[in-house]
Regions:
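ABC-fold ATPase nucleotide-binding domain signature/coupling loops
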Residues: 10-38, 53, 60
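Conserved D-loop/post-Walker B switch-helix segment of ABC ATPase nucleotide-binding domains
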Residues: 58-71
Length: 121
């Protein structure tokens, strides 16, 4: 249940009828954001200290995305992710900018944004 709450799926699980509810073949009854949060909950349930994620919040609305990042931060789980979303970058403790596989800049998004905001969607 901790993983479900951390992934901001509690209400969705309750509305579906619980953790054992059928969601259809490959989750066809779920929205894109629900599929993303379900995948995150599954990863969190493994009790890993670190997660590697590719655009973990790309299908989420802004409010849910902020709740998700706040929840992940509170969980103490280290998340290393790839994203071009400014909202996700703003939630990061540290942002690394790569160009052609080379490290070209790093730091908090608040300091990097003036130079790199054109890359964030």
């Amino acid at each position: 249940e901790w993983a479900v709450e951390t992934a901001r799926l509690g209400r969705d699980v309750a509305e579906a009828g619980g953790l054992q509810a059928a969601v259809g073949h490959r989750g066809v009854r779920l929205s894109g954001g629900q599929v993303q949060r379900l995948a995150l909950a599954r990863a969190l349930a493994c009790d890993a200290e670190m997660l590697l994620a590719d655009d973990v919040s790309s299908a989420l609305d802004a409010a849910t995305e902020i709740e998700l990042w706040d929840s992940l931060r509170a969980s103490g789980t280290t998340v290393i992710g790839a994203t071009s979303k400014a909202a996700a970058l703003a939630q990061a403790d540290r942002v690394v900018v790569l160009a052609e596989g080379e490290l070209v800049d790093q730091g908090p998004w608040s300091k990097l944004a003036p130079r790199w905001a054109h890359l964030a969607g």
